[in-house]
């Protein structure tokens, strides 16, 4: 069975996303392994990706973007640094928190354990319902449940899965300040053959550009002239020199789509470095698909054959 690394302990949203990926058959591998995996729990998202690079895991399930705070920067930075990795699948998870307490607790809540990101996403609920409680930081959403179970906090901002695993009572469910909060998770492994194109795919690259005027515009032109829909552009410092950046690009389409393949070849010629992060199916169309070039290819072949393009 595949070994899959993810942020632990048991009960995190990442584990919930991974369980759905496995149940939906999104993990590459032999048919006899379908539905099973060996968990490799780590103490951070970069740690999960390091487990893949070091051979301690076959894949890692990590968050890459959420609707409240945007891109998960530790994931981006870890994908861009170190030996190459590749994304094979993605899944979007609805995120709502569960306020947990120890069984039978009916006294005052003086302390609430919360992962800082979670605390920020439920701060209005906490102010309205537990305004006198002190928020104490937890290592993860699941760790908040463990803090409650082990008596380090009266209540915790956690997940339903963690409440079940730790045997805790639910004080409040589906807690979130912003409706429709969602997080996108990706399955990452070592470089290999991408999943087949489906017509609803995403391709991602990291670009390092020549430090000269117009370099970014020139790179973007390779997509625009081919009618490729860019769905995300983000810059991050290279961490090598002040004022130098690398650029993360997502586009609709697959490396097997001719326009995307041509754009990647052009970027390889133009850029200092192009790191391919993969082409993989999305749950729904991520932007307009790239145009088909079948008619144009037939026309060109006719010219080469001397038919005058007729």
Swiss-Prot record:
Residues 204-281 form the ACT domain. NCBIfam families: PRK11898.1. The record marks 183 as: Essential for activity. This is Prephenate dehydratase. It is an enzyme of class 4 (lyase). Coiled coil: none annotated. It comes from the Bacteria. It catalyses: prephenate + H(+) = 3-phenylpyruvate + CO2 + H2O. Its EC number is 4.2.1.51. Residues 3-190 form the Prephenate dehydratase domain. Pathway: Amino-acid biosynthesis; L-phenylalanine biosynthesis; phenylpyruvate from prephenate: step 1/1. GO terms for biological process: L-phenylalanine biosynthetic process. CDD domains: ACT_CM-PDT, PBP2_Aa-PDT_like. The lineage of its organism: Bacteria, Bacillati, Actinomycetota, Actinomycetes, Mycobacteriales. GO terms for cellular component: cytoplasm. GO terms for molecular function: prephenate dehydratase activity; protein homodimerization activity. Keywords: Amino-acid biosynthesis, Aromatic amino acid biosynthesis, Lyase, Phenylalanine biosynthesis. Homodimer.
């Amino acid at each position: 069975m595949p070994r899959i690394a993810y942020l632990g302990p048991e009960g995190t949203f990442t584990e919930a996303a991974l369980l759905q990926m496995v149940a939906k058959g999104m993990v590459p591998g032999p048919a006899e392994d379908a539905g099973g995996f060996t968990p490799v729990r780590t103490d951070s998202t970069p740690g999960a990706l390091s487990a893949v690079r070091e051979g301690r895991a076959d894949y890692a399930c990590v968050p890459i973007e959420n609707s409240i705070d945007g891109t998960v920067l530790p994931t981006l930075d870890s994908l861009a640094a170190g030996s190459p990795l590749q994304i094979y699948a993605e899944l979007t998870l609805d995120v709502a928190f569960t306020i947990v307490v120890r069984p039978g607790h009916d006294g005052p809540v003086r302390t609430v354990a919360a992962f800082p990101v979670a605390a920020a996403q439920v701060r209005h609920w906490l102010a309205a319902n537990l305004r006198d409680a002190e928020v104490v930081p937890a290592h993860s959403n699941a760790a908040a449940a463990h803090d409650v179970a082990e008596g380090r906090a009266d209540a915790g901002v956690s997940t339903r899965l963690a409440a079940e695993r730790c045997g805790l009572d639910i004080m409040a469910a589906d807690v979130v300040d912003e409706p429709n909060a969602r997080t996108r998770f990706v399955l990452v492994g070592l470089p290999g053959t991408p999943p087949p194109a489906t017509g609803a795919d995403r391709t991602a690259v990291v670009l390092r550009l020549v430090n000269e005027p117009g370099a970014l515009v020139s790179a973007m032109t390779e997509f625009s002239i081919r009618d490729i829909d860019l769905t995300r552009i983000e810059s991050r410092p290279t961490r090598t020199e002040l004022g130098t950046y690398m650029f993360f690009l997502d586009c609709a389409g697959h490396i097997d789509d001719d326009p995307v393949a041509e754009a990647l070849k052009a970027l390889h010629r133009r850029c200092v470095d192009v790191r391919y992060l993969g082409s993989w199916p999305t749950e729904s169309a991520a932007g307009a698909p790239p145009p088909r070039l079948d008619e144009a290819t037939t026309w060109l072949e006719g010219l080469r054959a001397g038919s005058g393009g007729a």
